[in-house]
């Protein structure tokens, strides 16, 4: 949620920011109209309350003088003002609800460093690491290689749950677990994160804090009987951990990491990446979250990105870093870098991590603040990123490390976790 004062004081700036993000600028005019009504009614109700207080004093004076008729007239006038106040209070409540609903649909403001563009075609490549492997044979896609080894089963997954689910056996199941432990060990032992074990089911309010609701409710798995949601990412509970709290500046930044399954309906992605494990309804991910100060948040974003990159470097997987343009930014992000790993089956790079600075957008929605050294209370900035998506990393290893005979070499960094050098 952005600051309503920004909309009041710089409406043209906000409209331009919304246009950069392909959003309708009309919502700014709608908010300004509601805000003007709210402030006008607030002035009216304050004046009426002042009148009522004045009448109360006059009634007291009349009582002391025994002026019965005056008391009755003043009392009736006071009741009339009270009814006016009640009516205006009802109007204020309704306007406040409308404003809150509309404010929750306004995206974050892109940072000045974000390139302007309509869609992903305007994204910028920042850097590459590693060279895609050149095979002297036709490499297999993971959706062929996995089943041929008897370690990946899409048919039985469909029998259990429908499309876009996977069953893995034996060493592939162990590889998924090894990757999770490898990532968590790196982030906690080398990068200073605190590991957190989290609920995978959260309240509507929790989903609203990070911006999943109300805009993306159709993408979420909802438990209707209890109005609870399966998390689409560990970012949701990690950020909300500190909602309605005031932190101390000396304790910032807070660095959290968590492994969780993630659940997404993918309602808007029909026909995309329908084969294999690239786009699943359930997938594993190690998440990284920072709660930091405004002064250092963009520098911290660069650090967070480097932590995600280090996972891919240790696994010796070719990747590139992309900066998203304004039209491709996520709803709550002010600035985002995507990490894309090379996949031979696509002969291209595919997203494996998205790292964002949400500035104070989530903090305002969740009322996450901190006390500065001078005693002033301000909103924190929140950062999030995948460190990284486990299933897509598994796919990248299977495809990039495959041999001509179908067996798969194990990256050196994972050999201590798996206890072997070759799979299959």
Curated annotation (Swiss-Prot):
The record's comment about this protein's domains reads: Consists of two distinct domains, a catalytic core and a N-terminal extension that is involved in tRNA binding.
Could you tell me the gene encoding this protein?
Answer: serS
Which pathway does this polypeptide act in? Aminoacyl-tRNA biosynthesis; selenocysteinyl-tRNA(Sec) biosynthesis; L-seryl-tRNA(Sec) from L-serine and tRNA(Sec): step 1/1
Record's keyword terms, sorted:
Aminoacyl-tRNA synthetase, ATP-binding, Cytoplasm, Ligase, Nucleotide-binding, Protein biosynthesis
Q: Which reaction does it catalyse?
A: tRNA(Ser) + L-serine + ATP = L-seryl-tRNA(Ser) + AMP + diphosphate + H(+); tRNA(Sec) + L-serine + ATP = L-seryl-tRNA(Sec) + AMP + diphosphate + H(+)
Instruction: Locate the residues binding L-serine.
Output: 233-235, 287, 386
Q: Which residues bind ATP?
A: 264-266, 351-354
Protein family according to the UniProt entry:
Belongs to the class-II aminoacyl-tRNA synthetase family. Type-1 seryl-tRNA synthetase subfamily.
Question: Know the name of this protein?
Answer: Serine--tRNA ligase
Q: Give the organism, scientific name.
A: Pseudothermotoga lettingae (strain ATCC BAA-301 / DSM 14385 / NBRC 107922 / TMO) (Thermotoga lettingae)
Predominant location: cytoplasm
Which Gene Ontology cellular component terms are annotated? Answer: cytoplasm
Q: What does this protein do?
A: Catalyzes the attachment of serine to tRNA(Ser). Is also able to aminoacylate tRNA(Sec) with serine, to form the misacylated tRNA L-seryl-tRNA(Sec), which will be further converted into selenocysteinyl-tRNA(Sec).
Entry's Pfam families?
Seryl_tRNA_N, tRNA-synt_2b
> What are the subcellular locations of this protein?
Cytoplasm
Q: How does it assemble?
A: Homodimer. The tRNA molecule binds across the dimer.
Any GO molecular function: ATP binding
**Xref: InterPro entries:** aa-tRNA-synt_IIb (IPR002314), aa-tRNA-synth_II (IPR006195), aa-tRNA-synth_II/BPL/LPL (IPR045864), Ser-tRNA-ligase_type_1 (IPR002317), Ser-tRNA-synth_1_N (IPR015866), SerRS_1_N_sf (IPR042103), SerRS_core (IPR033729), tRNA-bd_arm (IPR010978)
Q: Give the UniProt record's GO annotations in the biological process aspect.
A: selenocysteine biosynthetic process; seryl-tRNA aminoacylation
Quote the EC number. 6.1.1.11
């Amino acid at each position: 949620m952005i600051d309503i004062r920004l909309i009041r004081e710089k409406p043209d700036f906000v409209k331009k920011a919304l246009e950069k993000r392909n959003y309708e600028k009309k919502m700014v005019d709608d908010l300004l109209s509601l805000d003007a009504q709210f402030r006008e009614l607030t002035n009216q109700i304050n004046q009426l309350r002042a009148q009522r207080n004045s009448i109360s004093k006059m009634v007291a004076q009349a009582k002391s003088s025994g002026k019965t008729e005056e008391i009755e007239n003043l009392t009736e006038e006071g009741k009339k003002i009270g009814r006016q106040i009640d009516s205006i209070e009802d109007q204020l409540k309704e306007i406040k609800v409308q404003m809150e609903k509309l404010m929750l649909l306004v995206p974050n403001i892109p940072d000045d460093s974000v390139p302007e563009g309509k869609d992903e075609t305007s994204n910028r490549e920042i850097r590459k690491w590693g060279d895609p492997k050149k095979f002297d044979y036709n490499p297999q896609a993971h959706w062929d290689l996995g089943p041929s080894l008897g370690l990946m089963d899409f048919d039985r997954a469909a029998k259990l749950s429908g499309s876009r689910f996977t069953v893995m056996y034996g060493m592939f199941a162990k590889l998924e677990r090894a990757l999770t432990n490898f990532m968590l060990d790196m982030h906690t032992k080398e990068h200073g994160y605190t590991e957190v074990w989290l609920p995978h089911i959260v309240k509507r309010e929790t989903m609203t804090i990070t911006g999943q609701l109300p805009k993306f409710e159709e993408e979420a798995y909802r438990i209707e009987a209890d109005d609870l949601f399966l998390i689409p990412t560990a970012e949701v509970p990690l950020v909300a951990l500190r909602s309605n709290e005031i932190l101390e500046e000396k304790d910032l930044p807070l660095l959290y990491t968590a492994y969780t399954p993630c659940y997404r309906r993918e309602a808007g992605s029909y026909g995309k990446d329908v084969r294999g494990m690239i786009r699943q309804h359930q997938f594993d991910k190690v998440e990284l979250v920072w709660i930091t100060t405004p002064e250092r948040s963009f520098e911290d974003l660069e650090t967070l990105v480097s932590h995600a990159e280090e996972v891919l470097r240790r696994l010796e997987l070719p990747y590139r870093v992309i900066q998203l343009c304004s039209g491709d930014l996520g709803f709550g992000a002010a600035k985002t870098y995507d990490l894309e790993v090379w996949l031979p089956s696509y002969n291209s790079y595919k997203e494996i991590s998205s790292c964002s600075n949400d500035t104070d957008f989530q903090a305002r929605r969740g009322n996450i603040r901190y006390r500065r050294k001078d005693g002033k209370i301000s909103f924190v900035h929140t950062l999030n990123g995948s460190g990284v998506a486990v299933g897509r990393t598994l796919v990248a290893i299977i495809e990039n490390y495959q041999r001509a005979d179908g067996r798969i070499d194990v990256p050196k960094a994972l050999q201590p976790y798996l206890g072997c050098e070759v799979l299959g």
